[in-house]
From Swiss-Prot:
Belongs to the intron maturase 2 family. MatK subfamily. The lineage of its organism: Eukaryota, Viridiplantae, Streptophyta, Embryophyta, Tracheophyta. GO terms for biological process: mRNA processing; RNA splicing; tRNA processing. This is Maturase K. It comes from Trifolium repens. Pfam families: Intron_maturas2 (PF01348), MatK_N (PF01824). It comes from the Eukaryota. Usually encoded in the trnK tRNA gene intron. Probably assists in splicing its own and other chloroplast group II introns.
C-alpha cells in the first residue's frame, strides 16, 4: 500500500492527477514483477524473470515514445498498435502495467476508507480464503433452501469502461485503456465471446481479475442496498468477504445517493434469514423460508443483470434446491448439510421415553474425481488415477524433484485438511508419492523396485504422509494429540493465500 501511495504522489507532482503518464515509468513494471508470482498448486513459475528484465522494460518504453501518436494501421492488424511488432511479448507486459496503474487510486481510497472505519486490524487477521467456511458452519445448519448462482459474464467492454469512469476522473487514461483492450484482447465485437474472454484471462490475468472484480463489486453494491431494504436486520458480517476494491467508501456513498433519490420505501419482501456468500464468479444464496421468496430473489438478480449491466441471463440457470438433499460446490469443496439422528432415553418417575433428536451438520468433502482430473491434466497420473512419471522434471536433481512433489502435496494437504472425510486426500497423496518415485526411477533409467532398493529412498518419501503429523504434534500437547484424532478432525490452515485450481474450474 505504501508503494502505491509513493508512486501516485510522484506522478501527481508531474502530471496533475493523470494516470496515463505512469505507463512510461520503469518502476510500474518493477512493481508488476514483484506482484506477479504464480499461485497455482500444480504449475511452476511462468518465467517472469526474463520478461521483466530491465533491458526489456527500457526497450518497451523507448518504442512507445517513438510511436507517432499510436496510429494504428488497418492493413496490418497483427502489428502491435503500441510497438508495431512483438505483440504477444510486449502486450502482456503492458497489460500488467495497466493493471497496476488502474489499481493504484482504488487501493489508496480503500486504505483511507478502512482507516476511517477502524477495521484495518480485523481485515489483516482474515488471511485465509477458508474464512468463508466458519460462516457456512454457523449459518447454513439453520437454513433449508440454497441457490447456486453463477454471475453472468462476459460483459461488454464499454460498460466496464463506463463503470470505471465513475470512480477515476482521467479521460486520457481510459481512452488509452479502451484502445489497448480493443486491439490486444479482440473485444471489438458487440458481445465478447467466451473464447476471447478465456484467452484474455490467460494472457492478462491481473488486468482481467481487476476488471472482473470491479464489475462484481458494482453488482454487489446494488445487491447490498436491496438486501438492507428487504430486511429488518443489518448484518455486520455481510461485507467481510467482499474483494477489497473501494467497497466500504462506496457503500457509504450508495446510502447517500439512494436516500436522496428514493423518498419512499421500496416494496421489497422482508426476509431476515437470507444469507449470501460469493467467491470469484460463483455465489451461494441460502434462506430458511419457503422457495417462493427465493424465487423472488432469483428474478431480482436476473433483472439486475439484464437492465443495469446488459447481460442476458436465463432463469433456468439458477436452481433452488433443498439444502438437506442437494450439495453445492464452493472453493473446490463439495458441501451439504447432513442430518444426524440420535435416540435419547429419558426417564420420569416410573415412565421411560425414547426421544429422537435430529441435528444438522455441514459436511465438507474433497472432490476426488475433479482432483484426479486436475492431476491428469498436469501429467501426474492418467484419467483413471494411475500414477505416471513426470519426464519433463527428469533434468532436475533428485532433491529438486522430491521438493517439487512435496510442495504440491503440502499445498493440497493444507487446502483440504478441513474436509470431513480425508480418505480422498490420502489417495491424492499416494498418487503424488508414486509419481515422484516413478519420475526418479525414470531419471536413473531403472525400475521403481530397483531404484528404491538401491537408493533407500523409502524413508525420505515417507515425508508425504508424516510431515503434517510432525508439525501438528509440535502445536498440540503430546498427551492430547493422537493420530486417530488428527485423521478424524477438520483442521483449517489460516495461511492459505493461494487459490486452488479447482476453484477456477467451478
Amino acid at each position: 500500500m505504501k508503494e502505491y501511495r509513493v508512486y501516485l504522489e510522484r506522478a501527481r507532482s508531474r502530471q496533475q492527477d493523470f494516470l496515463y503518464p505512469l505507463i512510461f515509468r520503469e518502476y510500474i513494471y518493477g512493481l508488476a514483477y514483484s506482484h506477479n508470482f504464480n499461485r497455482s498448486i500444480f504449475m511452476e513459475n511462468g518465467g517472469y524473470d526474463n520478461k521483466y528484465s530491465l533491458l526489456n522494460v527500457k526497450r518497451l518504453i523507448t518504442r512507445m515514445y517513438q510511436q507517432n501518436h499510436l496510429i494504428i494501421s488497418a492493413n496490418d492488424s497483427n502489428k502491435n498498435p503500441f510497438l508495431g511488432y512483438n505483440k504477444n511479448f510486449y502486450s502482456q507486459i503492458i497489460s500488467e502495467g495497466f493493471a497496476i496503474i488502474v489499481e493504484i487510486p482504488f487501493f489508496l481510497q480503500l486504505s483511507s476508507s478502512l482507516e476511517e472505519a477502524e477495521i484495518i486490524k480485523s481485515y489483516k487477521n482474515v488471511r485465509s480464503i477458508h474464512s468463508i467456511f466458519p460462516f457456512l458452519e454457523d449459518k447454513f445448519t439453520y437454513l433449508n433452501y440454497v441457490s447456486d448462482i453463477r454471475i453472468p459474464y462476459p460483459i461488454h467492454l464499454e460498460i466496464l469502461i463506463q463503470i470505471l469512469r465513475y470512480w477515476v476522473k482521467d479521460v486520457p487514461f481510459f481512452h488509452l485503456l479502451r484502445l489497448f483492450l480493443s486491439h490486444f484482447c479482440n473485444w471489438n465485437c458487440f458481445i465478447p465471446t467466451k473464447k476471447s474472454i478465456s484467452t484474455f484471462s490467460k494472457r492478462n490475468p491481473r488486468l482481467f481479475l481487476f476488471l472482473h472484480n470491479f464489475y462484481v463489486c458494482e453488482y454487489e453494491s446494488i445487491f447490498l442496498f436491496l438486501r438492507n431494504k428487504s430486511s429488518h436486520l443489518r448484518l455486520k458480517s455481510f461485507s467481510v468477504f467482499f474483494e477489497r476494491i473501494f467497497f466500504y467508501a462506496k457503500r457509504k456513498h450508495l446510502v447517500e445517493v439512494f436516500s436522496k433519490d428514493f423518498s419512499y420505501t421500496l416494496p421489497f419482501f422482508k426476509d431476515p434469514n437470507i444469507h449470501y456468500v460469493r467467491y470469484q464468479g460463483k455465489c451461494i444464496l441460502a434462506s430458511k423460508n419457503v422457495p417462493f421468496l427465493m424465487n423472488k430473489w432469483k428474478y431480482y438478480f436476473i433483472h439486475l443483470w439484464q437492465c443495469f449491466f446488459d447481460v442476458w441471463s436465463q432463469p433456468r440457470t439458477i436452481n433452488i434446491n433443498q439444502l438437506s438433499e442437494h450439495s453445492f460446490q464452493l472453493l473446490g469443496y463439495f458441501s451439504n448439510v447432513r442430518l444426524n439422528r440420535s435416540v435419547v432415553r429419558s426417564q420420569m418417575l416410573q415412565n421411560t421415553f425414547l426421544i429422537e433428536i435430529v441435528s444438522k451438520k455441514l459436511d465438507i468433502i474433497v472432490p476426488i474425481i475433479p482432483l484426479i482430473r486436475s492431476l491428469a491434466k498436469a501429467k501426474f497420473c492418467n484419467v483413471l488415477g494411475h500414477p505416471i512419471s513426470k519426464p519433463v522434471w527428469a533434468d532436475s536433481s533428485d532433491f529438486d524433484i522430491i521438493e517439487r512433489f512435496l510442495r504440491i502435496c503440502r499445498n493440497l494437504s493444507h487446502y483440504y485438511n478441513g474436509s470431513s472425510k480425508k480418505k480422498s486426500l490420502y489417495r491424492i497423496k499416494y498418487i503424488l508419492r508414486l509419481s515422484c518415485i516413478k519420475t526418479l526411477a525414470c531419471k536413473h533409467k531403472s525400475t521403481v523396485r530397483a531404484f528404491l532398493k538401491r537408493s533407500g529412498s523409502e524413508e525420505l518419501l515417507e515425508e508425504f504422509f508424516t510431515e503434517e503429523e510432525e508439525i501438528l504434534s509440535l502445536i498440540f500437547p503430546r498427551d492430547s494429540f493422537s493420530l486417530r484424532r488428527f485423521h478424524r478432525n477438520r483442521i483449517w490452515y489460516l495461511d492459505i493465500l493461494f487459490s486452488n485450481d479447482l476453484v477456477n474450474d467451478e
